[in-house]
């Protein structure tokens, strides 16, 4: 079986019974189940949700996204072998640890296959909830350019690249393009302040102003749980992005939950602690792939400058990356997933066929 065949690159064409268009994101696709199938599975599987709660099948792919573009390799390699299974395994591990530590639930109800989650439909909070323990990435670039205010937070003089911040900082940005919010540009992934959120909490999809403090509490607590666990395997949790949303429990009560993925190499920076102590930055995250791209192309400004998005999209579309660059990130993702979970990540010979068989035989969702 070739590498290209082991990669699940297209994940929005599965014959799952649905009555709505499939939502296809950069990495995951979402299939909204019919009311009948949702109600049947809730009853058959005993999910702890309201009997009429809408459910969805969420299928991850092995696609690799960076700088808001999807990249591919030579020889028809459309993704990173093992990436999807590694990401899901890591998120599953952290969500369980959150629950064990008395934090909030997630949207995941069932895990039929390493690439598949059955989830409860949530009302998303329209914020990328970012938390930073070290100054690096976009925050460092802004600081190096002389900026001393970041997301409304005053930064002290004398900070050094890749060093620990004086405090754990929450630096939110917008999720999607939000229109009509005073002081917030109508663009994707724009940095915002806490005051922006407080003044316009309904526009960011919070049910109440009090929930802002709850989201901040869950963000910090979740960050600290993962950070402490990673310390035990000689890794540093540098920064991360969480997402939150609202669901209703079986009694009909609304609750704020974690959603999407948490603590993965896609949504976080994770550094090797021993290498860091020796003065080296060794990435166990997608940041290594981002750095490869910045070094691979002669004009890295195309990747960093949002005004040059058409050029960037053409760069991703027209360039076959070396296979070894994708295999490097494969080894990184599988390696950190196995360290975190303590379990092997096995590559499927034909993930799409496996998913269809399981969803047909065990869930009755394939026509």
Swiss-Prot record:
One cellular component term from this protein's GO annotations in UniProt: cytoplasm
GO biological process, one term: 'de novo' IMP biosynthetic process
Gene3D superfamilies: ATP-grasp fold, B domain, Phosphorylase Kinase, domain 1
Enzyme Commission (EC) number: 6.3.2.6
Catalytic reaction(s) noted: 5-amino-1-(5-phospho-D-ribosyl)imidazole-4-carboxylate + L-aspartate + ATP = (2S)-2-[5-amino-1-(5-phospho-beta-D-ribosyl)imidazole-4-carboxamido]succinate + ADP + phosphate + 2 H(+)
InterPro entries: SAICAR_synt/ADE2_N (IPR028923), SAICAR_synthase_Vibrio-typ (IPR014106), SAICAR_synthetase_CS (IPR018236)
SUPFAM superfamilies on file: SAICAR synthase-like
Pathway(s) where this gene product acts: Purine metabolism; IMP biosynthesis via de novo pathway; 5-amino-1-(5-phospho-D-ribosyl)imidazole-4-carboxamide from 5-amino-1-(5-phospho-D-ribosyl)imidazole-4-carboxylate: step 1/2
Any GO molecular function: ATP binding
Family matches, as Pfam families: SAICAR_synt
Keyword list, A-Z: ATP-binding, Ligase, Nucleotide-binding, Purine biosynthesis
HAMAP family, per database record: SAICAR_synth
Family listed: Belongs to the SAICAR synthetase family.
Cited PANTHER family: PHOSPHORIBOSYLAMINOIMIDAZOLE-SUCCINOCARBOXAMIDE SYNTHASE
Protein's name in the database: Phosphoribosylaminoimidazole-succinocarboxamide synthase
């Amino acid at each position: 079986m070739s590498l290209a065949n082991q990669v699940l690159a297209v994940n929005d064409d599965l014959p799952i019974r649905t009555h709505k268009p499939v939502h296809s994101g950069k990495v995951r696709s979402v299939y909204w189940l019919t009311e009948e199938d949702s109600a049947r599975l809730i009853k058959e599987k005993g999910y702890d949700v309201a009997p009429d709660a809408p459910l969805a099948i969420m299928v991850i792919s092995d696609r690799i996204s960076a700088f808001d573009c999807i990249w591919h390799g030579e020889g028809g390699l459309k993704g990173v072998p093992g990436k999807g299974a590694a990401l899901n395994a890591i998120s599953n591990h952290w969500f369980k640890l959150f629950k064990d530590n008395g934090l909030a639930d997630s949207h995941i109800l069932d895990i039929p296959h390493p690439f598949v989650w059955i989830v409860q439909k949530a009302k998303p909070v329209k914020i990328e909830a970012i938390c930073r323990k070290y100054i690096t990435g976009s925050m460092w670039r802004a600081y190096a350019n002389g900026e001393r205010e970041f997301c409304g937070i005053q930064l002290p003089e004398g900070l050094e690249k890749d060093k620990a911040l004086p405090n754990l900082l929450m630096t939110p940005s917008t999720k999607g393009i939000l229109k009509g919010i005073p002081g917030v540009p109508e663009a994707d992934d724009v940095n915002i302040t806490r005051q922006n959120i407080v003044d316009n909490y309904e526009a960011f999809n919070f049910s109440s102003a009090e929930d802002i403090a709850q989201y901040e509490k869950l963000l910090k607590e979740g960050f600290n749980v993962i950070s402490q666990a990673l310390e035990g395997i000689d890794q540093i949790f540098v920064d991360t992005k969480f997402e939150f949303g609202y669901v209703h429990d079986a009694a009909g009560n609304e609750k704020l939950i974690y959603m999407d993925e948490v603590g993965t190499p896609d949504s976080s920076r994770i550094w090797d602690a021993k290498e860091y102590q020796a003065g080296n930055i060794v990435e166990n995250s997608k940041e290594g792939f981002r750095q490869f791209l910045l070094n691979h192309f002669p004009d890295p400004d195309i990747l960093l400058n949002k005004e040059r998005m058409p050029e960037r999209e053409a760069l991703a579309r027209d360039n076959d990356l070396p296979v070894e660059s994708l295999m490097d990130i494969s080894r990184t993702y599988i390696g950190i997933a196995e360290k975190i979970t303590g379990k092997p990540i096995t590559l499927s010979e034909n993930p799409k066929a496996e998913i269809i068989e399981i969803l047909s035989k065990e869930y009755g969702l394939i026509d």
